[in-house]
C-alpha cells in the first residue's frame, strides 16, 4: 500500500511546512502560554523538546498509509500520464467511471470538463491532467493536515499531563534551568496525580525543616575548589608605605594631660621651682596628669620586608555522584524516616541542579537500590518514598555495597553518604580497613548523617565528615523555638 511519505514525494507536497505550522500553533496555544508565564524555567526545557516532536511527526507521516481509494486514483493518474492523446481518448470513459466509483472530488469536475468540449485535443488532455494533479495535491494536503491534527491533539494532551506534573514538582526539585530541563525529561513517564503527591508531601516537610535542607546543601557544596599554598616558595622583597606620628609635629591643636616634659605648659613647669609643690609635680608626672600642648602631625615612610612568594595551586574538587545508603531499621521509623527521606529528596534536588547522579541504597536485612537522577527518576523517587522502615541494621553490608559500587569507573569520584542513627554493631575489621584504603588511595569521601545523638563513636570514626541532625524531642523543640 502507498505510504503518505511516498505520495508527498510524488506530488511534491511540502510536509515540512505543515509540520512547522502545527508546532507553532501548539506552542501558541493558551494552555502553554499560561504555563510558560507561571514556570519560566520549564519554558526552555519544553522548547528544547521541539526537535524531538518534529522528528516524531516526520516519522508518523512517513509510516502513515494512504487510503485504498486514493491509492488507486493515484495509480490511475500515473498511468494516464504515460498515455498519448489518442490513447487517452480511448481510456477516458474508463477513467471517468473509475473516478466516479472511487468518489473522487475530481470526478464531477472531470465529467463537466469533458462534456463542455466536443473534441479532446492535446491541450485539453494536458489541462485534464493538470487539474487532476491539483485535486490529488489537495487530497494529499488534507490527509496530512488531518493526521497532524490528530497528532497535535495527542501531543497537546501529553504535554499538558507533563506540565501538570512538572509544575507541581518544579518548586521542590528544580533549582535552576538545568534541573528544570532534567525534571521535564523525567516527566515523560506514565504517572498519576496520586503518585507524585508523595513527592509534594515530603517537599513540604523539607520546607518545614530548614536546618535539614541547609545540611544537605552544605554536604552538596563540600567539594568546592581549595587553594593550597606551596611549601617551597622563594623569598621576595615587599615594599609598603607605613604611616607614623611625625617627629616634628606640624601644629598645636589643643591641650592634653600627659607626661611629655618637652611640651609642658609654663605654669606646670613653674610648680617645679616651688618646694611645697615639687612632690605634687612628680606625682602628676607619674600619673601623666601634667597639662601639655597637644601637637598634630604625621608622616609616611617606606618599609621594606622579606616574605615568601605566594603561589597557590587550586585543587579542583570534582563534584561527583551521590551514593546514599539509608538505614531502614525499626529505630529509624517515624520522624527519623521522614527526615531521611526528605534529606534524600534534597540531595536529588542538588543532583538535578548540578547534573550529578543520585543513587539510593536502602540497607536492612537486604539492599534495595534506586537511581533518582535517571530517566525514570520520578518513578524511582516515588517507590523510594513509599518504602517502610521496619527492618534490622546491617551496616557492614551497606559498606560492602558502597565499596562494590565505587569500584566502577563511572562512580570513581562519588561521595558516599550514610544516613542512620548509628545504633548498631561495630564494623568488621576488613570493612574498616577497606574504607580507610579507599579514603587514602582513591580520595573517596564518606559522609555520615547522624539522626541521633547516641550513635556509637567507634562506628562514626571512619567517616570524613559527620553531619549531625538530632531528631530527639528536645532538639526538635529547640529548632522550632529558634524559628
Curated annotation (Swiss-Prot):
KO phenotype (gene knockout): The double ravA-viaA deletion mutant shows increased persistence when grown in the presence of fumarate and kanamycin.
Bilayer-spanning residue ranges: none
Domain of life: Bacteria
SMART domains, alphabetized: VWA
Membrane topology of the entry: Peripheral membrane protein
Record's note on what induces expression: Part of the ravA-viaA operon, which is under the direct control of sigma S in aerobically grown cells. In cells grown under oxygen-limiting conditions, expression is largely dependent on the anaerobic transcriptional regulator Fnr. The operon is coexpressed with multiple anaerobic respiratory genes, many of which are regulated by Fnr.
Annotated GO CC locations: cytosol; membrane
Annotated compartments: Cytoplasm; Cell inner membrane
Residue ranges of the region described as Flexible middle domain MD: 192-311
Primary subcellular site in the record, as a coarse category: cytoplasm
InterPro entries, sorted: Uncharacterised_CoxE, Uncharacterised_ViaA, VWF_A, vWFA_dom_sf
Keyword field: Cell inner membrane, Cell membrane, Chaperone, Cytoplasm, Membrane
Result for mutant: residue 476 to E: Abrogates interaction with lipids, contains slightly but statistically significantly fewer lipids and increases resistance to gentamicin under fumarate respiratory conditions
Signal peptide: none
Region (N-terminal domain NTV): 1-191
Start and end residues of each stretch annotated as VWA domain: 312-483
PANTHER family per the UniProt record, alphabetical: PROTEIN VIAA
Protein role: Component of the RavA-ViaA chaperone complex, which may act on the membrane to optimize the function of some of the respiratory chains. ViaA stimulates the ATPase activity of RavA.
Domains (record comment): A protomer can be divided into three domains: a highly alpha helical N-terminal domain (NTV), a flexible middle domain (MD) and a C-terminal VWA domain (CTV). The MD domain interacts with the triple-helical domain of RavA and increases its ATPase activity. Interacts with free FrdA through the C-terminal VWA domain. The C-terminus region also mediates interactions with phospholipids at the inner membrane.
Family the UniProt entry places it in: Belongs to the ViaA family.
Description of how the protein assembles with itself and partners: Homodimer. Interacts with RavA. Lipid-bound ViaA is still capable of interacting with RavA. Interacts with specific subunits of the NADH:ubiquinone oxidoreductase I complex (NDH-1 or Nuo complex), particularly with NuoA and NuoF under aerobic conditions, and with the fused NuoCD under anaerobic conditions. Interacts with uncomplexed FrdA, the flavin-containing subunit of the Frd complex, in oxygen-starved cells and the interaction is modulated by RavA.
The protein's name: Regulatory protein ViaA
Gene it is expressed from: viaA
